[in-house]
Amino acid sequence: MTFQQRALTGLLLAGVSFSSLAALTFQTYNPGEKGIFPVSSTLISGEKQAILIDAQFGTKDGQALVDMIKQSGKELTAIYISGGDPDFYFGLEPLVSAFPDVNVLASKAVVQHIEETKDRKLQYWGPILADSAPSKVFVPKVFNRSEFSLEGEKIYVKELNTHQSYLWVPSQKVVLGGVAVTAGMHVWTADSQTPEARSEWVQALDKMADLKPARVIPGHYLGDMPQGIEAVSFTKAYLGQFEKTLSKAKNSKQVVAEMVKAYPTLSGQQDLELSAQVNTGERQW
């Protein structure tokens, strides 16, 4: 472990000397229908300190996170980015400006993915985000550990260095599902382009359910926050239906038609259409 890694670890473990452990609280910001992606960012707070998990897609929503953190009255000790897709980190710019001394951290795999894809992602999404696009993309520092603490309470990174990584807070029996968990909308599968990748995704969901969480915060959701493990069960069932449909369909239009038939009330059909095009080989992503 390098000196820098030890310093970052010390920062995240700084609360372990607290003699009594206050229950952690979870405040989730999600732009819902107002966002291009309804992505979740969660402020995990102890008595005095807090850690932000994920940083939104655009700078306007990133500024909303700044306001939420300041209103909490807690000392922000770190920002942890759980996924390498731009809706997890493009909103960092106002956060880094407001909290310049706070480390932005991510696993080795997430940092590598961001470094490899950020330029072309900004080229594609910048015009769509318009005045909410970042003028500078911030890359997190590598923090390749599977656990850290907030005021003595352990937070575990499960499935570290995979596309399905998520956070587990055993003291509160809460899962932050990250990119692996969706609710109330079609599941984005454009980044999981093989049966093997989707099978690994399902296996991660099974392991998540085995933890018997009391609450799972989806990485993306529309509508009300689902209860218990509803979002895990939904995501797994959706992936199963998608796999079955994809194996029989001749083109993306057939995939879309069958998935809409199976899930007629879901939002996010544009996500389904793009995912179907990618997974049928009609479009590169």
Per-region residue spans from a language model:
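Accessory terminal helices/loops
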Residues: 210-215, 223-285
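Active-site environment of divalent metal-dependent phosphoester hydrolases
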Residues: 36-38, 59-61, 84-89, 111-114, ...
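Metallo-beta-lactamase
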Residues: 57, 115-233
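Conserved beta-strand hairpin/beta-sheet module of binuclear metal-dependent hydrolase folds
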Residues: 23-71, 166-179
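Bacterial N-terminal signal peptides that target proteins for export
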Residues: 1-9
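Active-site metal-binding motif and surrounding structural segment of the metallo-beta-lactamase
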Residues: 60-105
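N-terminal signal peptide c-region/cleavage motif recognized by signal peptidases
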Residues: 17-20
